[in-house]
Amino acid sequence: MAGSAPEAVLVGLGAIPGAWLRLKVVNHFQPMVPKKHWGTFLVNVVACFALGLVLALNETCTASTGIALLMGVGFFGSLSTFSTFAVELLNELRAGQLLTALVLAVASIGVGLLACAVGYGIGTHA
């Protein structure tokens, strides 16, 4: 059943509110010039935590594949945004802000991985 129409519908139904929430969060932080990356950072960290949790629950509680597709692939997959993260890094590098780009990259990957591990840990003990 991989790639079936019902699975695509579940992913799509989850993706719509996830993408909308990402837009709202990123736009909320965008006018705050000193904190211009916080919106992207926040949605990515939240999505990492949630995907870790969904993965663990799917493994330990035999959560429905439909729930994993709806929430994991759809909602949290569209909430996170690696491409925007990459563009923000590129913009910092183009502006000569090597230290800012380095801190952003290390913090985003490190905190994202930690959030994913915490979500997974919570999910395995649920």
From Swiss-Prot:
Keyword Transmembrane helix (UniProt): yes
Its job: Fluoride-specific ion channel. Important for reducing fluoride concentration in the cell, thus reducing its toxicity.
Topology term for the membrane: Multi-pass membrane protein
Name of the protein in question: Fluoride-specific ion channel FluC 1
Gene behind this protein: fluC1
UniProt activity-regulation remark: Na(+) is not transported, but it plays an essential structural role and its presence is essential for fluoride channel function.
Recorded GO CC terms: plasma membrane
One record GO biological process: cellular detoxification of fluoride
Main subcellular localisation: membrane
Organism placement in taxonomy: Bacteria, Bacillati, Cyanobacteriota, Cyanophyceae, Synechococcales
Keywords assigned by UniProt, alphabetized: Cell inner membrane, Cell membrane, Ion channel, Ion transport, Membrane, Metal-binding, Sodium, Transmembrane, Transmembrane helix, Transport
Catalytic activity reported: fluoride(in) = fluoride(out)
